Amino acid sequence: MKIILNIFILIFILSGLTFANEVKIFEFTESELSKLDVRKVRGADNNTNYTVGSNENGNYLKAIANNAASGLGKEVKINLNKTPIINITWKVEKDLPGIKENTKKGHDFAARVFVIKKTGATLLSNRAINYVFSSNNEVGFNSPSPYTKKSIDNVLATTKENLNKWVTVKANVKEDFKKFHNLDVNELDGLAIMSDTDNSKLEAITYYQNIYFSAD
């Protein structure tokens, strides 16, 4: 009995270490959704419609953007020395074919997750990396936003390969801030989700699930 008890204690400790090395960002519940910071993009005609649901893998956020652009933000401190890897599970059901995403007229993404570092007193001074599920570009493509060089669009998934399929991707945020912004960032200040179609005037449907940071 003592041996069995010790085994259970060891399993519990190891499980605790595993969870300690993961930082979950969103629960995707009705209660959480009501508390998130909603920001409509200036000039957009409509807000993106966000709702929560669940499947066999847990809760998810569903986004419907019909000529719309608004994001859901959350202030959160992430220690990038301990957990530098962002993990995202997402699915694009309806994408945005034919647009040029690195131009102002086509700068829409069916799915994007921003990681944000405050580098000044105003929102405009912040630096961001915009991890996107592209409708037209290949995985690995990256470019500055056509609206500001302080935000970099980096393609982690594409509907050219995975339309209407759940995809799990990851990226080293600490390394990416150094690569794209030449910044040594030890701590993130916030994270945001957005599905937007205000430039193309099209409709996108996307699902987000299980967004967290990990050690590897």
Predicted regions and their residues:
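Bacterial N-terminal signal peptides
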Residues: 6-15
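Extracellular carbohydrate-recognition regions
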Residues: 20-43
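Extracellular/luminal beta-rich ligand-recognition
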Residues: 106-151
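Extracellular/lumenal carbohydrate-interaction signature centered on repeated Trp-anchored short motifs
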Residues: 75-86, 160-163, 184
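Solvent-exposed strand-to-loop "edge" motifs in beta-rich extracellular domains
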Residues: 89-95, 118-120, 174
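Extracellular beta-strand elements of beta-rich domains used
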Residues: 28, 191, 209-213
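Short carbohydrate-recognition loop motifs
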Residues: 50-71
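Extracellular beta-strand ligand-recognition surfaces/modules
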Residues: 108-113, 149-150, 155-159, 163-203
